[in-house]
Amino acid sequence: MTTKPHNPANVLLQDAKTGKLPESEGTLVLKEVIKNSAVMQLAKFEDMGGKPVKKFTFLAKGPGAYWVSEAERIQTSKMEWKQATMETKKLGVIIPFSKEFLKYSVQDFMQMAAPLIAEAFYRAFDQAVLFGTESPWGEDKSIFKIAEAKQKVITEGTGKNLYHDMVSLLALVEADEHDPNGLLTSRAFKSKMRNVVDNNGYPMFDPNSNQILTLPISYASKQIIDKEKALALIGDWDYARYGVLQDIEYAVSTDAQLSTIEGADGKPVNLFEQDMFAL
């Protein structure tokens, strides 16, 4: 005898404490993550094919062409291929709610919670990718740490003005035969970009097209950008890839103490004592 899957629109959350986010809400969460993640706006999506580890080959250096005379042997063209490995890691979030929400249908509750889930996801993702914050791959694999290790860093004020600093930053990317195609920064950096002018006094920041030096700009929230480390990052984002392995699963707990979340009194939240539950 088989059990029919429950309809999330008709089942209360208190009666379905574990499961997968309904398809519509799961899609909504992923769309919100992709739309708001500063990294994902610039990087390319890679289909994981339902596998936790994916290896793929990409062309690092293309074939060349040569001028030849009659009866002259055509040179052999060499192409450089490299292999990349993508490995998925589980990304989890804990959000406390008042117990009244247990009386919502699963679908209604998830519609309400979707923006909160998405924000927690894209914030954790961007922090890990950019600066290695709590990254399962380690801090050394972050974009900032790799750029720092390869001395691809320009300190603000090195040049005559910010325009010259940014041009120098572009040159660091181009030195490795890459085309810079995006700038990632915080909205607080906008005021500085408005003052960027070229040697002829023309502004380089176009707020209408959201570009500077013809580069599209992706803004990260203030909780993501560590201004002590970097004000802006420029690169060839075609080489940045991300993927998603599976649907989003959830579980409800009513008797746990949340060691990573503090209440107004500065103490860890105790769900049972405070009549709350955690998703």
Residue ranges of predicted features:
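Bulky hydrophobic/aromatic "packing anchor" residues in well-ordered structure
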Residues: 55-56, 95, 217, 279
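Active-site-surrounding "flap" and adjacent substrate/cofactor-binding loops of secreted or lumenal enzymes
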Residues: 9
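Extended oligomerization regions of viral-like shell subunits
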Residues: 152-277
